[in-house]
Amino acid sequence: MAVQLVLNFIIAVFWLFVTNSYTTNNFVLGFIFGLVLVYLLHRVLPGRFYVITLYRIIKLVIIFLIELIKANFDVLKIIIKPSIKNEPGFFVYHTDLKKDWQIVLLSNLITLTPGTVVLGVSDDRTKIYIHAIDFSTKEQEVESIKTSLEKIVREVGEI
């Protein structure tokens, strides 16, 4: 991915020199030409086409922000209405992720979401230990992590 992105920038800068016009519009045009050229050559360049990876990373950020906003409202409800019966507790989340960086990313995303904290990962890296501010919604929490965060982290890590 990095090789393709650097090549695209080199092509864009080369385009500026060839056209002898150093404007932002001309750079964008050169970048688009470079993008087309890199796409045509992506089978011989290492890694998958970098635009796909960038799209998946942007998708990960958007999904995380949505989950973050939802979790903030859930915690806000608990703070505003202390009469709500929440049951803090611990649970084990079973993950299918294999790469260490994916497990770390998922753990960080879970920890950054208000109301949940990752306590650790098992030695075999198949279980993540989580503390939730409301344990009564464990099934919903597990389903939310599985269908949104873990799914997109897996997509970002695909080759």
From Swiss-Prot:
UniProt keywords, alphabetically: Antiport, Cell membrane, Hydrogen ion transport, Ion transport, Membrane, Sodium, Sodium transport, Transmembrane, Transmembrane helix, Transport
GO molecular function annotation: antiporter activity; monoatomic cation transmembrane transporter activity
Activity regulation information from UniProt: Na(+) extrusion is completely inhibited by the H(+) conductor carbonyl cyanide m-chlorophenylhydrazone (CCCP).
Topological type in the membrane: Multi-pass membrane protein
Cellular compartments annotated: Cell membrane
InterPro entries (alphabetical): Antiport_suE1 (IPR004847), Cation_antiport_E (IPR002758)
Origin: domain of life: Bacteria
Biological process annotations from GO: proton transmembrane transport; sodium ion transport
Main location as per UniProt: membrane
TM spans (from-to): 5-22, 27-45, 52-69, 100-122
GO cellular component terms given for this protein: plasma membrane
Pfam families associated with the record: MNHE
Family from the record: Belongs to the CPA3 antiporters (TC 2.A.63) subunit E family.
Subunit structure: May form a heterooligomeric complex that consists of seven subunits: mnhA1, mnhB1, mnhC1, mnhD1, mnhE1, mnhF1 and mnhG1.
Function in brief: Mnh complex is a Na(+)Li(+)/H(+) antiporter involved in Na(+) and/or Li(+) excretion. Na(+)/H(+) antiport consumes a transmembrane electrical potential, and is thus inferred to be electrogenic. Does not transport K(+), Ca(2+) or Mg(2+).
Protein's name according to its UniProt entry: Na(+)/H(+) antiporter subunit E1
Gene: mnhE1
